[in-house]
A protein has these predicted regions:
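Extracytoplasmic metal-acquisition and chelation regions
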Residues: 4-291
Length: 291
């Protein structure tokens, strides 16, 4: 109890403006731009599913005390509008604002934006620009710091972009079909020349049908895809069944909608991207997997 009180006192004694993001990936971006001038926290904890998250009363209380709320937009946080309305008049920024999104092309979500734009390092730079502007309005005295932090982080994103491009370019052309549970890799695929196939387009784990599974099994078998993957925030049971039926391997767990805990393989967005592309290389490159 004493330690809990101590933590509460530390938070209340911290006079820095409070920034609350909807999920962990955005919190990581915000911390990189904010440096030590702002407090940054995420509503959704590492490992939690973001699409259908239901905010708790304590989440809403935290939001009402924040100075700024940061969301992704593009329909990712289905609960965000109710959440921000319940939080009162706290300013909210949408990091995808002004972006031309890729569109989902099938099922009930056809024509709607794919929300996973942070999976493209190039597009993530736009997120960083939004954060820099919002933080400079929130804390004008820190504007130079925010600009410097944003510039340094965008340089890391640019280097990451080249790193990922080189890694995926090394895959043989016939081995560039990425099979995941959710269609969360459209931006990565578009940037680096991958094809994608998946069990559901977005936010639709409950919509897996025998027909959809059979179609994916046929695709994996016909294209001789060596490995399939799934994301950390959903069950991989169906995808493992696809792998077994098609004669492929289950290639591992991607991180997309959530970072890992600090001691996991993807505690930051940069490490998340490297982890995922490492799995892609290992799973799809037959020469790599046979070493």
């Amino acid at each position: 109890l004493a330690s809990c009180r101590s933590r509460d006192q530390d938070v209340s004694a911290d006079s820095r403006p409070q920034v609350l993001t909807t999920f962990t990936v955005l919190a990581d971006l915000a911390r990189n731009v904010a440096g030590d001038r702002l407090q940054v926290a995420s509503i959704v904890k590492p490992g939690a599913e973001i699409h259908g998250y239901q905010p708790t009363p304590s989440d809403i209380e935290r939001a009402s005390k924040a100075d700024l709320i940061v969301e992704n937009g593009l329909g990712l946080e289905l609960w965000a509008q109710r959440f921000t309305a319940a939080a009162g008049d706290v300013p909210t920024i949408t990091l995808s604002e002004g972006m031309k999104p890729l569109l989902i092309t099938e099922d009930a979500y056809s024509g709607k934006p794919n929300p996973h734009a942070w999976m493209s390092p190039q597009r993530t730079m736009g997120y960083v620009d939004h954060l820099e502007r919002a933080f400079s309005q929130l804390d004008p005295a820190g504007a130079e710091d925010f600009a410097a932090n944003a510039s340094a982080y965008k340089a890391k994103l640019q280097a990451l972009d080249q790193e990922l491009r080189k890694a995926i370019a090394a895959l043989p052309a016939q081995q560039r079909l990425l099979v995941s549970c959710e269609g969360a890799f459209s931006y990565l695929a578009a940037d680096y020349g991958l094809e994608e196939a998946y069990l559901w387009p977005v936010n639709a784990e409950s919509e897996i049908t025998p027909k959809r599974m059979a179609r994916l099994i046929d695709t994996v078998r016909e294209r001789e895809v060596p490995a399939v993957f799934c994301e950390s925030t959903v069950s991989d049971k169906a995808q493992r069944e696809v792998a077994a039926a098609a004669g492929a391997r289950f290639g591992g767990t991607f991180y997309v909608d959530s970072l890992s805990p600090p001691d996991g393989p993807a505690p930051t967005l940069l490490e998340l991207q490297r982890h995922n592309v490492g799995l892609i290389r290992k799973g799809l490159d037959l020469s790599e997997s046979n070493r």
